[in-house]
């Protein structure tokens, strides 16, 4: 089986990072190194996090950068360049592996075909996740795995390029061959890379059995800002997003969510859905 390292950008890390690191050390297939790309050294608790790796076969590397130096694409890319593993798994510091088989399932997904350039995990809602966000998790991360390539664009549209660095594994040789993540982006470095990979003839694997716990309860204003960043990143990369637009997928999600709310006794949440959807749409088009 391929050797894997994990790359995690951090900023003011806390309890979730500690839980994430503990779960990584418990994996049925151990990783070689965890590479932390930490923004601002003053927020890093070395005693708390680095002591977890004492006596472990998995090693920890911590690289500190300034907040002004952070970029979603470049910072992760620099972390991958510090690895010599066959596979680099990108994770965010607020996700937690669901079980001991996360790494194993990601590696098996990459081995499904020589064409697979990346594999991303299923995101399960946290215990405090709201009803609407819980349904959104299920919509975007179903229970069935699949491979996605250029031949699926007519069926899947923009979701052909969907990939999430909340937890995604990359074959390092293909990653470097394609130039890696874009070096300047406020968002979406994962989908931009996936789009380029698909256009180059590779596939993206959705590994439903590789699972992490990760969800957010965004306010309307937070959702607006998030979708503004999403819209900017898509506008900056028409070579990826110019042919396959995301509006149709968003409308489908709203319709299916509304139907699910009514059918499952949550009709009183319809105003919340309207506000959240309006914030997403406004942010995207600002």
Question: Model-flagged regions — what are they?
Answer:
Residues 101-133:
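Conserved donor NDP-sugar-binding/catalytic core segment of glycosyltransferases
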Residues 13-26:
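Short, well-formed alpha-helical segments that are part of the catalytic scaffolds
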Residues 66-83:
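Glycine-rich, basic loop-to-helix element that forms the pyrophosphate-binding segment
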Residues 32-41, 65:
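Short beta-strand/loop segment that forms part of the nucleotide-sugar
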Residues 150-170, 186:
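A recurrent flexible, glycine/aromatic-enriched loop bordering the glycosyltransferase active site
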Residues 186-193:
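Acidic donor-binding loop at a coil-to-helix junction in glycosyltransferase catalytic cores
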Residues 226-232, 236, 240-286:
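Non-catalytic, C-terminal membrane-associated alpha-helical segments of glycosyltransferases
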Residues 86-96:
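Short beta-strand-to-loop acidic/aromatic patch adjacent to the donor-nucleotide binding site
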């Amino acid at each position: 089986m391929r050797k894997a390292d994990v790359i995690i950008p951090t900023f003011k890390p806390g309890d979730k990072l500690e839980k994430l690191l503990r779960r990584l050390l418990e994996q049925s297939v151990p990783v070689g190194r965890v590479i932390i790309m930490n923004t601002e050294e003053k927020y890093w608790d070395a005693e708390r996090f680095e002591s977890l790796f004492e006596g472990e076969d998995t090693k920890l590397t911590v690289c500190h950068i300034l907040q002004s130096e952070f970029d979603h694409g470049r910072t992760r890319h620099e972390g991958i360049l510090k690895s010599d593993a066959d596979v680099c798994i990108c994770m965010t510091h607020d996700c937690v592996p669901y079980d001991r088989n996360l790494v194993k399932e990601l590696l098996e997904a990459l081995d499904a075909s020589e064409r697979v350039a990346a594999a991303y995990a299923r995101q399960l809602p946290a215990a405090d996740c709201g009803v609407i966000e819980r349904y959104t998790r299920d919509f975007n991360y179903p229970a069935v795995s699949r491979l996605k390539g250029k031949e699926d664009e007519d069926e899947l549209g923009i979701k052909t390029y969907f990939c999430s660095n909340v937890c995604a594994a990359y074959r390092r040789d293909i990653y470097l061959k394609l130039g890696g993540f874009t070096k300047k982006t406020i968002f979406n470095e994962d989908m931009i890379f996936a789009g380029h990979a698909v256009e180059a003839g590779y596939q993206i694997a959705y590994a439903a059995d590789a699972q992490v716990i990760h969800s957010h309860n965004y306010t309307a204003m937070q959702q607006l800002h998030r979708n503004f960043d999403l819209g900017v990143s898509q506008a900056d990369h028409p070579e990826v997003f110019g042919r396959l637009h995301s509006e149709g997928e968003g409308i489908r999600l709203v319709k299916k969510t509304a139907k699910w709310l009514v059918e499952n006794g949550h009709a009183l949440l319809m105003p919340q859905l309207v506000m959240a959807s309006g914030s997403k749409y406004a942010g995207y088009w600002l």
